[in-house]
Regions:
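Residue-level detector of conserved, function-critical positions
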Residues: 1-11, 23-158
Length: 158
């Protein structure tokens, strides 16, 4: 990839324009994504989606744009992505929308913590050493002696 020796976004774009069938295309697309989205803002993810629609990392751009918007933790985020975008993760967003208003409560059994909804149904199995209440969609947990945050799907976020 002599054309990309300087490591700039422009050089990777030029490489793909000159060599669209190159076996190095996946690596070049990854570099384009990484360079273009370095700032990790809504604007750069939107720009990437508009400019690089055939890039293999477009789904990552969509997902990261959605994640950045979720920082506001406002129900309008779900409606915006469902109604006004072509995001490929509509089902995941519908689930997040449903979980947004769900109340999860920590519980303890056999020395481990998990979460249940207000009807008592277990929503996240007890597997944590400690769990706190959800606030703005995240709950502090301790697992294997390490602190972190989980979302209402039970996925580690931080």
């Amino acid at each position: 990839m002599e054309l990309t020796e300087d490591g700039t976004l422009e050089s990777y774009i030029a490489f793909l324009d000159s060599n669209p069938e190159s076996p190095l295309r996946p690596q070049a697309e990854k570099q384009i994504y990484n360079l273009y989205t370095q700032k990790r803002t809504v604007e750069v993810y939107k720009g990437f989606i508009e400019e690089f629609q055939t890039n293999q990392y477009i789904d990552s751009a969509w997902w990261n744009w959605y994640q950045v918007e979720l920082i506001r933790y406002d129900s309008s985020v779900f409606n915006f992505f469902l109604e006004e975008t072509d995001i490929p993760f509509k089902e995941e967003i519908r689930l997040d929308q449903k979980l947004f208003s769900a109340k999860f409560l920590p519980f303890s059994t056999a020395g481990e913590f998990g979460f249940m909804d207000v009807t008592g149904e277990v929503t996240i199995p007890a597997k944590y050493e400690f769990a706190n209440f959800f606030q703005e969609g995240l709950a502090i947990i301790v697992q294997n002696g390490k602190y972190g945050f989980i979302n209402k799907r039970g996925e580690i976020q931080i």
